[in-house]
Amino acid sequence: MRIERSFLGAEGVGETIERRLWEQGVTHWEEFDRACEGVGPTRAERIESFIEGGRRAIDADDVSYFDRAFPTGARWRLYESFREQACFFDIETTGLDQRSSVVTTVSLHRDGETETLVRGDDLTRESLEAAFEDAGLLVTFNGARFDVPFLREAFGIDLDHPHIDLMPTCRKIGLSGGLSAVEHELGIGRELPDVDGREAVRLWREHERGADGALERLIEYNREDTENMVPVMETVVDRLDRELLPAGARPDAD
């Protein structure tokens, strides 16, 4: 969904009012008029203010304006208009406890390219800050509860960027479970279907003991986690668009 189709960011506009506008044929900012039925003068003024600020934000590539305006559950709407700023990332660790476990690899995918940082080599606070510096929008799977706080604890970095967490977003269309389960449901394949989080821990331990190929396999798994979030994101956004928007306003009607 293009940002210009959203009215949800205006103060006093919830999903009910937004849908009412869409059903009247007001499916784009350009089509909004103060005379729209069921809006009222105060709310109309707020919508116009949101649209004015939104246009400036789009011109400035400012994702944060909409991140502040939208409720958490609507952040998936940021993707279509700001996909070029999206940085997909995933971490591997030696366990779930942030205090007793360590981060072993971090993979970041942006602009069609993937970079992996490895513990003991180039995985440092400075390299992470540099990697995330130009990211306007973060995309993770369960990152709000795991990846982001883990990196904060391990490296002292605050990733306060606009952030789409795919796990709760997938639930909106009935997809539950971990990333691999979602991929399977969507028909997205893997080169390493037999590797999971537990195997990733074992691979790191083997690497520490000097086993040939263990690190390479771990990196491949981490990169696959990261890169596969792209088709998941694309599919989920498309389905949510089709569920929410009236037929004439859907992407295939543009």
Q: In which residue ranges do the predicted regions lie?
A:
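N-terminal accessory regions of nucleic-acid-interacting proteins
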Residues: M1-R83
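Catalytic micro-motifs at enzyme active sites that drive phosphoryl/nucleotidyl and oxygen chemistry
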Residues: R75-L78, T93-D97, S127-L128
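Two-metal-ion RNase H-like nuclease active-site motif
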Residues: E84-G95, N222
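Acidic active-site catalytic centers that drive phospho-/nucleotidyl reactions
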Residues: D90-E92, D147, D165, D225
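Surface-exposed cleft-lining segments at the edges of enzyme active sites
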Residues: T93, E113-R119, A214
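Short glycine/proline-enriched turns and hinge-like loops at secondary-structure junctions
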Residues: Q98-V102
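Conserved DEDDh/DEDDy metal-dependent 3′-5′ exonuclease domain
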Residues: T105-L108, T114-G189
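Acidic, Mg2+-coordinating catalytic module of metal-dependent nucleases/exonucleases
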Residues: E185-A253
